[in-house]
């Protein structure tokens, strides 16, 4: 959900900028239907400085829904003013033209950065390293609906790590750390399995020099915020029951078959 919210915010600001509109973040009955609890609903504000947000929001305005999971060029070009956008909007194309502003909005809060810098110092700097790899494994909800969002096999991570430096630490970020602690693939001292919350995990991802992402908007954003092109991603995003993910892919990243 965190990554999905980030796409929704970035696309809203991107469309507003392209059209010369003001924008705001939803906070009301419609957004309550999207997020299970208040913590999820306001996680963007818990994580980021969000310098570009506005407070005014009209729940009574009509809803404008994206046409499909693909980038909706017609919506981007012709979106009317004073509407509530509804959809996933999972493409950089919605906000590439204001990348600088989105990066400023998604700058982590100082309290978040402080803890992450302390962890980085302990795992990387104090051990004599200057670089690290961020690796994300998404499992729990993907195990429930594998034909929609399949869990990536360990072979994907093996191949991805084989393409990156072999003598630097690897942060392992996962929603199932107990599984990772028990898996022989992660037994080496090279791996540090994070048990932080997802805000601090994404912050640490953004500090990594190389990123191996899962088929997940969470690690997509962690890699995007890192701001480098040394990102390895799976070609497989959805299973046979899923959507067409073509526009979520970024050309400058490297993609592996699964």
Language model regions located:
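N-terminal pre-catalytic "stem/leader" segment of glycosyltransferase-like enzymes
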Residues: 1-28, 32
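Short, solvent-exposed loop/turn segments at secondary-structure junctions
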Residues: 1-3, 28-33, 89-92, 138-142, ...
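Aromatic-acidic/polar surface patches that form glycan- and anion
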Residues: 1-5, 149-153, 197, 204, ...
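A structural signal for isolated positions on well-ordered beta-strands in alpha/beta enzyme cores
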Residues: 22-24, 134, 169-171
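Secretory-pathway luminal glycosyltransferase catalytic domains
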Residues: 28-166
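Short, aromatic/basic amphipathic alpha-helical patches
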Residues: 34-52, 179-188, 243-249
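Leloir-type glycosyltransferase catalytic cores
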Residues: 80, 115, 240-258
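Donor-binding and catalytic core of enzymes assembling or modifying cell-surface/extracellular glycoconjugates
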Residues: 164-234, 239-247
